[in-house]
């Protein structure tokens, strides 16, 4: 059974236990802790770094301290010198191979330990060991090892680093929210948002119209400001290859059997994603309609050209460019994608999870069980999830419904919390690590606070 617990900045967590043995308590460095380690020397074009937090109310000079590395090649080698570094009260510093404040990289692919102390074995202020503290798990290219909470908490493995910002636990439970429901979320001092937070829903996928419609943008800002106060992550729910409610082909037919990817379309969508981050400070972007329409001439397989341009290539290239753009920003922006389910998704829609997973942090397959004329069974739900788990380093949060259909009854029927929970428990018995409910204002919602901690 899956035992993955939660996401920090929308991040994958696997709890480990810190071992403070050997740490010095009276050396003038009390209050210093290692809060985050990005061990990336085994990953191309990616820096290693270590974040140190001063939890005390006073300024601390790091003169006399060093960071010492133990791995298969180094046996207590000092990899930085901290003589000229001073850390202010309740402040943090990052030592990185990028600026050579960390003179040697660290690899997460094998066991290692770093020690913050006056030497490798004396005056130890803090330490982190991969196998002991993080269950021998390596990190994603964009992830890190984080201590949560920062002041003496357990170490966890995350899919997104939080360099220079606070580490905190966000549960891997999300809900899709339309812009038309923002008034309900704001009313009565954000009573709905507080209720959803109390039930364990730490992520909101807020529809793009909340940001694009100038008459709604102010409400979106209110929601995001309150969400940050409550510890809730807001993701901009974008419609990628869909403009003005119409699907847009990302490939132009040049004639003669050749095609080209519409770079102008890619640029426009990527600029919009960056605008959501700049103007609204969203925590992530959620890609919907990152696919072909799947019907008629717009079946993905019908868009393949002799010069190598094809449907899955268009999707993968867009994801690559978006990832590159967002990784150039200082924020840890999470990228998730709504994924189609069913047979032959690559043929009809062009989505290739193995390739997309190089650039996407979280897959959110729409594991929708209920339709107007039929329903899938639990075995189908498990098989569908298995099509996404294990094919890449992307996390998989399954999208499930909060409504169903019944013969002789018109329209959707909202499900009870127990009914939604029953479907969620099917997901928990897969390798998925999170849930996304579709959608707010249909049905009721179970308490998921301890859902990923429980035995089933």
For each feature predicted by the language model, list its residue ranges.
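Catalytic domains of carbohydrate-active enzymes, especially glycoside hydrolases
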Residues: 187-212, 279-284, 356, 362, ...
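Aromatic-lined substrate-binding rim segments of carbohydrate-active enzymes
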Residues: 192, 203-243, 302-329
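Substrate-binding cleft of secreted/luminal carbohydrate-active enzymes
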Residues: 365-378, 382, 394-456
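A structural motif detector for short, solvent-exposed N-terminal "entry" segments of globular domains
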Residues: 20-72, 105-108, 135-140, 166-168
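Solvent-exposed beta-edge/loop recognition patches
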Residues: 45, 75-154
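Active-site-adjacent "subsite" loops/lids of carbohydrate-active enzymes
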Residues: 183-187, 219-225, 233-280, 413, ...
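Substrate-binding cleft/loops of secretory-pathway carbohydrate-active enzymes
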Residues: 334-372, 407-413
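Aromatic-lined carbohydrate-recognition surfaces of secreted/lumenal glycan-active proteins
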Residues: 175-180, 235-239, 286, 290, ...
